[in-house]
A protein has these predicted regions:
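Short conserved catalytic/interaction loops centered on acidic-Pro-aromatic/His motifs
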Residues: 81-84, 99, 125-128, 146-152
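Solvent-exposed, charged helical/coil patches
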Residues: 1-12
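Residues that form generic nucleotide/phosphate-binding pockets
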Residues: 108, 112-119, 158
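Immediate flanking context of iron-sulfur cluster ligation sites
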Residues: 115-136
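Local cysteine-cluster metal-coordination motifs and their immediate loop/turn environment
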Residues: 133-146
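Short microdomains enriched in Cys/His and/or Lys/Arg
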Residues: 150-175
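Mg2+/Mn2+-dependent nuclease catalytic core
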Residues: 10-113
Length: 175
């Protein structure tokens, strides 16, 4: 269990799993796989199944992963903790990638959050990816249903002006 910031002794080790916190300042909720640190200085750790991308100086976290852990850092900061870096652990390669929480990343993250909110309030759903190798590994594939959505969109375009019921499959040929 993660004690509120300031309640732990300055040298007390923190190791809390599956932490849920919110930020009133940023209107965000974060689920954090692991929070580790000492006293009120902590590091969020996010576990990913995949692998890091290859960077010029070695393994790097993907942009989406960097933004995710920055949200976690912002929420922790809003709850009184000091967060200077985050870690993404990639299970496929057993590598920990450290991410400094600097002003550039904070600005990028808040901009991403703002754009996500704008997209959500606009009510427009982005089109699904077509035959993307990312989809089967995505945690939202069961909600997004990219193949099914793309098929329905094709039928909807073909059926404009037609009052047929939309289906995923062509009706059987009549004998």
């Amino acid at each position: 269990e993660l004690l509120p910031a300031g309640e732990a002794a300055a040298d007390e080790k923190i190791h809390a799993r599956s932490v849920q916190l919110s930020s009133e300042t940023h209107k965000l909720i974060a689920g954090i796989d692991l929070v580790e640190g000492e006293g009120s200085v902590v590091t969020p750790v996010e576990y990913k199944r995949g692998r890091p991308r290859d960077g010029a100086e070695g393994p790097e976290a993907w942009d989406a992963d960097r933004v995710q852990v920055c949200v976690q850092a912002l929420v922790l900061r809003d709850n009184g903790f000091t967060v200077n870096e985050a870690v993404v652990y990639y299970d496929s390669t057993k590598q920990r990638v450290r991410i400094p929480i600097d002003e550039v990343l904070v600005t990028q993250t808040l901009d991403t959050v703002s754009r996500a909110r704008a997209a959500a309030t606009a009510g427009l759903i982005p089109p699904p990816l077509i035959d993307s190798p990312k989809c089967p590994r995505c945690s939202l594939v069961g909600i997004c249903l990219p193949d099914e959505t793309a098929a329905m969109m094709r039928f909807r375009q073909e059926a404009r002006g037609d009052d047929r019921q939309l289906t995923l499959f062509e009706p059987p040929e009549e004998a």
